[in-house]
C-alpha cells in the first residue's frame, strides 16, 4: 500500500501501461490467425471512429506488435524489476497484511504478474508509446481490445498518460481515481464503438452502461488466478474499468463530447468521486483526519497514504458482508494511514483514521471495525470495550480503537498496552 509503488490501488498495473483484460468465457477462446496487414487496417479504421466520437485529433501513427503469452509474462516481470525495489515490495505487502486484505504468506509481485498475464488481451505501453496485441486472442476479442488500447493511445497523444498517472502517485486514493479515468474512458469508448457497429449507442442509455459494467465485473470468473486472488485484488483490478466506465458515462451525459477532455483536465480526486459522480460535479473534497499518536521513539516511518471509500467498501465486504459495505462505505469522508517500523524489535505499527459524514455513521463503523479485528486476527484479547474505546491485544501486539465524534482511529501492533 506504499505510495510510489504501483500507487497501491491497481497493484502493479500502473507501471505496466494500460491493459485490456479478457472478458470472454473460455469456450470463446481459440487460437487467432493474426494477420499484421489486417491489424494495420483495423487500427486506421478504429482511430478514425474514436476521433469522430471524442473530437480528439490523431497526432501520429500508433506502432504495434504481436506478443505471446510468455512474452507478456516476461514483460511484466521486467517492469516489476525496473520500477520497484525489494523494499518497495516489502512495504506494499506490509500495508496489505496489516489491514488484513491479504494473508501473511501473500506474494504480491508473483500474484500480480500471474493475474495480469492471465487476463491480458492487449496493452498499450505508454513508456514506449506502443500497442501490443496478444497472439492468443480470438478475432472478436482482438477487435474490442484494439479499440480499447487505441483509445489509450489517442488520450496519450493529448494528455501524456504517464505524466497524468505520476501526478497522482503520492495519494493512493487519488491515484486509483486517475486510473479509473484512464481505463473508464477507454472502456466506454470500446463499448460505444461496438454499439455503433450494431446501429446503437450508449448515449442516453444509462441502463445499458450499467448492464455492461455488471457483465465485466463477472467476466473474470472463469480464470483460476483471478478466482483465487484475494477480494482486494479482484475488486481493485476491475474497479477502474467498471466504475470508471460508469463515471465516464455520467460525465458524458452532462458535458457530451467535452467529457472526454474534462476528465483528464479536471480529474476526480478520490474513488468516492468516481463512485458518486455528483460529488465530482459538486467538488466534494476528501478530509484528512489526524492520525492517532504513539510513543514512536526507535521507529522509522515507512509510508503514509490515504484509505478511500473503495478500500473501506472492500474491507467491510471482506470481513462482514456486501450489504453492510454498500450501506456504510458511501458515508466515508476521508481516511489516512501510516506504517512505522522498529527494525530492532521487528515491530510494525499501523496508525489509521477515518472520518464519516456524521456521528451515527462513525458509530456504526466503530462497531463494524471491532468485527473486522476479531476476524482478521486468529487470537484477540479484549481488555476494554465501551465508551468509545475498544482495546486489547491481537496477533501482532496491542491495539486501541477510538470513536471521537465522526472519526474512528486505530493503533495496531503496539509494544505496550494502550489502555490500562
Q: Which stretches of residues belong to each language-model region?
A:
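Pan-zinc metallopeptidase signature
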Residues: 220-348, 353
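Active-site recognition of the HExxH zinc-binding catalytic motif
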Residues: 50, 144-161, 186-187
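Short pre-active-site segment immediately N-terminal to the catalytic Zn-binding motif
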Residues: 131-147, 174-178
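Acidic helix-start/capping segments at beta-turn-to-alpha-helix junctions
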Residues: 59-79, 170-173, 204-214, 266-269
Amino acid at each position: 500500500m506504499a505510495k510510489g509503488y504501483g500507487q497501491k490501488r491497481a497493484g502493479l498495473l500502473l507501471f505496466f501501461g494500460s491493459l485490456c483484460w479478457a472478458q470472454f468465457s473460455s469456450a470463446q477462446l481459440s487460437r487467432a490467425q493474426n494477420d499484421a496487414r489486417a491489424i494495420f487496417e483495423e487500427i486506421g479504421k478504429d482511430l478514425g471512429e474514436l476521433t469522430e466520437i471524442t473530437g480528439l485529433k490523431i497526432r501520429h501513427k500508433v506502432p504495434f506488435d504481436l506478443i505471446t503469452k510468455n512474452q507478456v509474462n516476461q514483460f511484466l516481470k521486467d517492469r516489476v524489476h525496473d520500477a520497484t525495489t525489494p523494499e518497495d515490495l516489502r512495504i506494499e505487502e506490509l500495508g496489505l497484511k496489516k489491514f488484513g486484505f491479504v494473508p501473511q504468506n501473500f506474494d504480491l509481485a508473483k500474484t500480480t504478474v500471474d493475474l495480469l498475464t492471465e487476463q491480458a488481451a492487449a496493452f498499450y505501453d505508454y513508456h514506449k508509446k506502443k500497442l501490443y496485441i496478444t497472439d492468443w486472442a480470438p478475432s472478436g476479442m482482438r477487435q474490442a481490445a484494439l479499440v480499447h488500447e487505441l483509445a489509450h493511445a489517442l488520450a496519450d497523444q493529448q494528455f501524456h498518460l504517464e505524466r497524468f498517472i505520476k501526478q497522482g502517485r503520492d495519494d493512493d486514493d487519488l491515484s486509483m481515481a486517475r486510473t479509473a479515468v484512464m481505463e473508464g474512458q477507454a472502456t466506454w469508448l470500446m463499448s460505444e464503438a461496438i454499439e455503433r457497429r450494431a446501429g446503437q449507442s450508449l448515449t442516453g442509455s444509462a441502463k445499458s452502461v450499467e448492464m455492461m459494467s455488471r457483465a465485466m465485473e463477472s467476466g473474470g470468473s472463469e480464470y483460476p488466478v483471478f478466482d483465487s486472488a484475494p477480494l482486494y485484488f479482484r475488486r481493485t483490478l476491475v474497479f477502474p474499468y467498471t466504475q470508471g466506465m460508469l463515471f465516464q458515462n455520467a460525465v458524458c451525459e452532462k458535458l457530451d463530447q467535452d467529457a472526454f477532455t474534462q476528465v483528464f483536465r479536471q480529474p476526480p480526486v478520490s474513488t468516492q468521486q468516481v463512485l458518486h459522480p455528483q460529488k465530482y460535479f459538486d467538488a466534494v473534497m476528501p478530509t484528512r483526519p489526524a492520525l492517532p499518536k504513539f510513543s514512536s521513539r526507535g521507529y522509522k516511518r515507512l509510508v503514509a497514504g490515504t484509505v478511500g471509500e473503495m478500500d473501506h467498501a472492500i474491507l467491510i465486504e471482506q470481513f462482514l458482508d456486501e450489504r453492510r459495505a454498500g450501506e456504510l462505505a458511501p458515508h466515508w469522508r476521508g481516511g489516512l494511514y501510516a506504517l512505522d517500523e522498529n527494525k530492532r524489535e521487528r515491530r510494525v505499527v499501523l496508525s489509521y483514521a477515518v472520518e464519516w459524514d456524521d456521528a451515527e455513521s462513525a458509530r456504526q463503523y466503530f462497531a463494524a471495525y471491532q468485527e473486522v479485528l476479531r476476524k482478521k486476527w486468529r487470537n484477540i484479547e479484549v481488555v476494554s470495550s465501551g465508551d468509545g474505546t475498544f482495546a486489547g491485544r491481537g496477533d501482532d501486539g496491542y491495539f486501541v480503537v477510538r470513536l471521537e465524534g465522526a472519526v474512528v482511529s486505530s493503533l495496531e501492533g503496539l509494544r505496550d498496552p494502550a489502555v490500562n
